C-alpha cells in the first residue's frame, strides 16, 4: 500500500501536533501541581497513554494494518529522524574537538602549563622513575664505581719519531741475512762471516783459567777427589 507524498506530509504534521498538545498538557498539569508532580507515577502513565492513543489514531488514518505496512509508511520517516540526530551529535563532537585544538594552539595554554611546572623536567616523577629503572639494570660494584670516578685512563698519543721500516732482502741478492744455524741450510760462498754453529758456552766459563796443579796432584783431579785422597793419607800416617 503506497501513500501519496501529500498524505505523508499531512500525517507528519498531525503527529507533530498531537505530540505538542500532549507535551503542553503535561506541562500545564506540572505547573498546577506540586513540585514533586514529575515523580508522580499516575501523571507519567497518563502522558504515555496520550502518546499511545495519538499514535494509534495516526496509524488508523493512514490505513496501516500490518507490521510490513507500518515499516513501509513510517520507516523512511524514522530513518530521517535518526540521521538528523546522528548528524547533530557528530556536529557537536566536531565542535568540541575544534575548541580543544584551539585551546591547545593558543599561546596562553603554553604559559599556563609553564607556570604550573614549579620544578624542571629533569626532576619530574617520570624522569626519576626512568633513572631508577636504568640504575637497577646497570648494577656496578662499589670498587668499580669508585675507580671509574677516581681517575681517567691515560690517553695514548702517536709518537712523533718515525722509524724506518726494514726492507726484505730480495732472492737475487747473494748475501742472505744471518740467522742461527743458517749455514746448515744455505751455502753462501761470498759471505765468509757465516760459520757453522758451535756448542754454546757461557762467557764466564770460557774466560775462567784453570789453576796449575799442586805437587802430588794429578792434572785431572777435582776438589772432591783431592779431599778424599788427603783424608786417606791422614789415616795412613796416623796408623804408622
UniProtKB/Swiss-Prot annotation:
Superkingdom field: Eukaryota
Region annotation Disordered: where it falls in the sequence: 197-222
UniProt biased composition (Polar residues): 197-210
Protein name stated in the entry: Uncharacterized protein K11H3.2
Organism of this sequence: Caenorhabditis elegans
Amino acid at each position: 500500500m503506497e501513500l501519496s507524498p501529500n498524505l505523508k506530509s499531512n500525517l507528519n504534521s498531525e503527529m507533530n501536533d498531537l505530540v505538542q498538545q500532549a507535551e503542553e498538557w503535561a506541562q500545564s498539569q506540572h505547573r498546577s501541581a506540586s513540585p514533586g508532580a514529575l515523580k508522580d507515577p499516575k501523571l507519567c502513565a497518563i502522558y504515555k497513554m496520550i502518546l499511545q492513543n495519538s499514535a494509534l489514531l495516526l496509524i488508523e488514518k493512514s490505513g496501516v494494518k500490518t507490521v510490513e505496512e507500518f515499516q513501509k509508511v513510517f520507516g523512511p520517516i524514522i530513518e530521517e529522524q535518526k540521521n538528523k540526530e546522528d548528524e547533530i551529535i557528530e556536529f557537536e563532537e566536531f565542535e568540541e574537538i575544534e575548541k580543544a585544538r584551539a585551546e591547545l594552539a593558543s599561546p596562553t595554554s603554553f604559559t599556563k602549563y609553564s607556570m604550573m611546572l614549579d620544578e624542571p623536567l629533569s626532576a619530574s616523577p617520570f624522569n626519576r622513575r626512568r633513572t631508577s629503572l636504568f640504575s637497577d639494570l646497570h648494577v656496578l660494584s662499589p670498587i668499580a664505581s669508585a675507580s671509574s670516578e677516581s681517575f681517567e685512563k691515560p690517553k695514548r698519543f702517536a709518537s712523533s719519531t718515525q722509524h724506518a721500516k726494514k726492507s726484505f732482502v730480495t732472492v737475487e741478492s747473494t748475501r742472505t741475512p744471518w740467522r742461527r744455524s743458517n749455514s746448515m741450510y744455505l751455502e753462501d760462498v761470498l759471505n765468509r762471516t757465516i760459520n757453522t754453529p758451535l756448542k754454546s758456552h757461557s762467557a764466564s766459563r770460557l774466560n775462567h783459567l784453570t789453576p796449575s796443579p799442586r805437587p802430588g796432584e794429578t792434572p785431572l783431579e777435582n776438589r772432591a777427589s783431592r779431599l778424599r785422597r788427603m783424608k786417606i793419607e791422614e789415616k795412613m800416617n796416623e796408623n804408622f
